[in-house]
Design a protein with these regions (language model features):
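Secretory targeting and sorting signals
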Residues: 1-37
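N-terminal low-complexity, Pro/Thr/Ser-rich intrinsically disordered segments
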Residues: 39-77
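Acidic Gly/Asp/Thr-rich repetitive segments characteristic of extracellular carbohydrate-active
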Residues: 61-106
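Acidic glycine-/aspartate-rich tracts in secreted/extracellular proteins
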Residues: 89, 110-113, 185-186, 378
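Extracellular beta-strand-rich solenoid/capping regions of secreted or surface-exposed proteins
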Residues: 93-100, 115-179, 187-205, 211-222, ...
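Right-handed parallel beta-helix
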Residues: 176-186, 200-213, 234, 240-257, ...
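Extracellular beta-rich repeat passengers
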Residues: 332-456
Length: 456
C-alpha cells in the first residue's frame, strides 16, 4: 500500500486520518495533496475514498445469499464493534467479542495463523509432540510391512496429538453477524482455516487467503480402493452456515504448492484440502468475483452421498469467479441447487494433472450459464465435466477455447463406462442473480476484476 509522502504537512495527514476514522471524505485535504488522497483511498480499499467496505451489504438480487432475508454480515456494528487487527491474537479476540453482536473486522497487512500468543512464528517442529517423526511414521505404516489397515499405535497417536496442537492455532471460528474485510489491496491471512460453523449472516471480502498448510497429514489406506494422504484444513469451511457472501477473495496454496511435495507411499504428500468447502447443511451462499488458484481440490459443495440432511439445502451461487490452475472440484456438487454463471476457467499449458472442473454428484442440480474455459490442447471439452451418481446438468452459453460448446451433449457422447448420461432438466430456474453477461465478456471482466484488492 502506498503511504502519504513524508513531505505531507502534518496537519494534512492528521485531517486525513481523522476523516478516515470518521468514515468521512475529506475533499479539501485531498484536493490540497493528491498523493496523500490516493493513499487514503487505498486504506479503505477501493478507488472511492469515502467507501467503507465493512458497511456494505449484499445486493437484494445477488444470488442465493440474497434469499430469505439477505446477507448483511456485521454492517450494522456499533463503533465499539469495529476492529482493525494486525495479528492472529487480535483477530481471534475481535471474532470472540460480543457473541452474535454485529461486528466489522478489518485485517491490516499480513496475519499468519501459525504464530503463538506473543506473535512469534511457529513451524511444524514447534507443534510436533510425543515423539512424532515423519521418518518413524513412514517406517511404521509402510504398506509393504504394515499392510492395508488404518494406522494405529505410538506414531499415529503422536501424529494426532501434534495435529491437535496445530489445529488449536490455525482453526479460527467466525460467528454470526460478522464482516471480515481486508484493508487496502494486500490484506493477507495465511495458514488459517476459517470456519463458519453453524453461524448465520457472514461476509468475507477483499482478502488473500493463503496456504492452509497441514503439518501432519494422515495416511488413509484403501479408501474405496484408493490409498491416499488426507489433510485437515480448508482455507474457508462453511459447515452448517447460512447467508454467507464471499466476495473478492483470492484463495490459493501460495507459499507451499502441493506439486513440490514428495511422493510418499506412491502418492503425493498433500498438504492442503479444499480452498472453500461448503458442507453439512450449509445454505444460501453467494461466492462472487473471487479467485481460486494453484491448488488441487478447489471447492466441494456437499461432502457425502449419505448426508441426506443436505437435501433441499446447499443452495449456492457462483458468479464472476476465476478458477485458475486448479486440478478438480470447481465445484463438485452433491444435493445443491447451484447457479454457476459467468465464471472464468483457465488450465495452464503445463498442467499435466488436470482432472475436471464440474463434478456432478448425487442429486446435484447445477444450472450453468455463460462460463468460459481456456485449456491447453491435450484437454478436451469432454474432460470438463465428470459425474458420479449425478443425473442432471443444465448448461448453456459455454465457451471452450473461444468456441461455443454443449457440454451436456459432449458429456453424454464421450462419458466413460462408469458414468451415466445426464439430462438437462435440473428442476429449477435461478431467480436471484445480477445481469448474466456473455461468456466472452465475463472472461474478460473476471480476468481484470476478480480477487482481493480489486474492488472498484
Ligand atoms: Ca475439506
Amino acid at each position: 500500500m502506498r503511504r502519504a509522502p513524508a513531505t505531507t504537512p502534518r496537519a494534512v495527514r492528521l485531517a486525513l486520518a481523522l476523516a478516515l476514522f470518521a468514515g468521512l471524505a475529506a475533499p479539501g485535504a485531498r484536493a490540497a495533496e493528491p498523493a496523500a488522497g490516493a493513499g487514503a483511498a487505498e486504506a479503505t480499499a477501493g478507488r472511492d475514498p469515502g467507501r467503507d467496505l465493512g458497511r456494505e451489504t449484499l445486493a437484494a438480487d445477488d444470488g442465493w445469499a440474497a434469499a430469505e432475508g439477505g446477507t448483511t454480515g456485521g454492517a450494522a456494528a456499533d463503533e465499539a464493534h469495529v476492529f482493525t487487527v494486525r495479528s492472529r491474537g487480535e483477530l481471534v479476540r475481535a471474532l470472540d467479542a460480543g457473541g452474535d453482536t454485529p461486528k466489522i473486522i478489518r485485517i491490516a497487512g499480513t496475519i499468519d495463523a501459525n504464530t503463538d500468543d506473543r506473535g512469534r512464528p511457529l513451524d511444524c517442529s514447534d507443534y510436533a509432540t510425543d515423539g512424532y517423526d515423519l521418518t518413524a511414521y513412514l517406517a511404521a505404516y509402510d504398506p509393504r510391512t504394515w499392510g492395508g489397515a488404518k494406522p494405529s499405535g505410538p506414531q499415529e497417536e503422536a501424529r494426532r496429538a501434534s495435529a491437535a496442537r496445530q489445529a488449536e492455532r490455525v482453526e479460527i471460528a467466525v460467528g454470526s453477524n460478522t464482516t471480515l474485510v481486508g484493508l487496502g489491496e494486500n490484506a493477507v491471512l495465511t495458514g488459517a482455516s476459517l470456519r463458519v460453523d453453524g453461524a448465520d449472516n457472514v461476509i468475507v471480502r477483499n482478502l488473500h487467503l493463503r496456504d492452509a498448510y497441514d503439518c501432519f497429514p494422515v495416511w488413509q489406506p484403501n479408501q474405496g480402493g484408493l490409498s491416499d494422504w488426507k489433510t485437515a484444513y480448508d482455507n474457508l469451511w462453511l459447515r452448517g452456515a447460512t447467508h454467507v457472501w464471499i466476495d473478492h477473495v483470492t484463495v490459493s496454496d501460495r507459499g507451499h504448492p502441493d506439486d513440490r511435495e514428495p511422493t510418499l507411499f506412491g502418492r503425493n504428500y498433500l498438504r492442503h484440502d479444499g480452498l472453500l468447502d461448503i458442507t453439512n447443511g450449509s445454505d444460501l451462499i453467494t461466492v462472487s468475483w473471487s479467485r481460486f488458484a494453484d491448488h488441487d481440490k478447489a471447492m466441494l459443495i456437499g461432502n457425502s452421498d449419505s448426508a441426506t440432511g443436505d437435501r433441499g439445502r446447499l443452495r449456492v451461487t457462483l458468479h464472476h469467479n476465476a478458477f485458475e490452475n486448479v486440478v478438480q472440484r470447481a465445484p463438485r456438487v452433491r444435493f445443491g441447487q447451484v447457479h454457476v454463471y459467468n465464471n472464468r476457467y483457465v488450465v495452464p499449458e503445463n498442467a499435466h494433472d488436470y482432472r475436471y472442473s464440474w463434478g456432478i454428484s448425487t442429486e446435484s442440480a447445477v444450472y450453468a450459464e455463460n462460463n468460459a474455459f481456456t485449456t491447453p490442447g491435450h484437454i478436451e471439452a469432454a474432460d470438463l465435466v465428470k459425474s458420479w451418481n449425478g443425473s442432471t446438468l443444465h448448461q448453456t452459453g459455454t465457451l471452450f477455447n473461444g468456441y461455443p460448446v454443449d457440454l451436456l451433449t459432449i458429456h453424454n457422447a464421450y462419458n466413460s463406462g462408469s458414468e451415466r448420461d445426464l439430462t438437462a432438466d435440473v428442476g429449477w430456474t435461478p431467480a436471484l442473480h445480477g445481469r448474466v453477461d456473455s461468456a466472452q465478456r465475463a472472461d474478460h471482466d473476471v480476468a481484470r476484476g476478480a480477487g482481493a484488492g480489486r474492488i472498484r
